Regions:
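Extended ligand-binding regions for polar small-molecule ligands
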Residues: 1, 27-39, 106-131, 176, ...
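Extracytoplasmic small-molecule ligand-binding "clamshell" domains
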Residues: 1-87, 154-158, 222
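A ligand-binding cleft/hinge motif common to bilobed small-molecule-binding domains
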Residues: 61-62, 68, 73-88, 134-143, ...
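Glycine-rich, phosphate-binding/catalytic loops in enzymes
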Residues: 26-28, 92-93, 193
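A mature extracytoplasmic/lumenal domain signature
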Residues: 11-15, 57-59, 95, 107, ...
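Pocket-lining segment of extracytoplasmic ligand-binding domains
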Residues: 106-187
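Hydrophobic/proline-rich hinge and linker segments of small-molecule sensing/allosteric domains
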Residues: 6-13, 89-113, 209-213
Length: 228
């Protein structure tokens, strides 16, 4: 990558992470990788032959395959670290820790006081996410004790957490799951969201960028940058 003077960053278009404003890239992940580009060129003393970060927008479900197939070199998105994913990719130093997966409901929610109250309720999530897996396990546990399962609805796999939060806010779907950091941020923008910070599907999670297992040097550079 340094030899080709290009690092290809896989990004998911969203309202905050990566988007274009009047033809110019913007967003949290754009700004982070723009800083990383400067960090790499300073550290490696590239001089006039600078290494550039190129952004490749993909759909959420394409992130892993695009990385493994060599379309991009780094997943520039907060991916939830899981043992299964660690078998396939190299994760960086976490960009977020103590991550919780929480329930978010809309403007006319049915009362939800704890996880048990999800029995018989509709929840919409992207089926490719760890949220879906966790909801499936919880729903199965309800059925084993004779309670109604969660009415688990598969959202379109193109939809991001932000998309689903907007749909919940508009009353189009009753509830979804996202991480606590994202829920807190968007509740300040979307006034009809009801957060349930104490209803936690999973906790103590970590968010990280990811590289291929054959890119330890890139992962090392990312780790050093994240720690600065």
């Amino acid at each position: 990558m340094v030899k080709t003077h290009e690092i290809r960053a896989l990004v998911v278009p969203s309202h905050s992470g990566f988007f274009y404003d009047k033809g110019q890239p913007r967003g949290i992940y754009y700004e982070a990788l723009d800083e990383f580009q400067r960090f790499v060129n300073t550290k490696l003393k590239t001089g006039n032959l600078k290494t550039n970060v190129t952004f490749i927008p993909v759909r959420p479900e394409q992130l892993e395959s695009a990385l493994l197939e060599g379309v991009g070199d780094v997943v520039a998105y907060g991916v939830i670290v899981t043992p299964e994913r660690e078998k396939k990719v190299l994760f960086t130093t976490p960009i977020g820790s103590d991550v919780k997966q929480v329930i978010v409901s809309g403007p006319t929610p049915r009362p939800i006081a704890n996880l048990d109250d999800l029995s018989g309720k509709e929840v919409y999530v992207n089926p490719l996410t760890v949220y879906y897996e966790n909801l499936q396990r919880l729903s199965e546990s309800f059925q084993k004790t004779g309670r109604p399962p969660i009415l688990l609805r598969k959202a379109d796999t193109n939809l991001t957490d932000e998309d689903l939060l907007e749909m919940v806010n508009a009353g189009l779907v009753p509830a979804t799951v996202t991480i606590n950091i994202r829920a807190q941020f968007w509740s300040k923008v979307l006034p009809h969201l009801t957060l349930h910070p104490n209803i936690v599907l999973a906790e103590d999670g970590q968010l990280a960028f990811a590289t291929r297992k054959d890119s330890p040097q890139l992962r090392k550079l990312l780790d050093e940058f994240i720690k600065t």
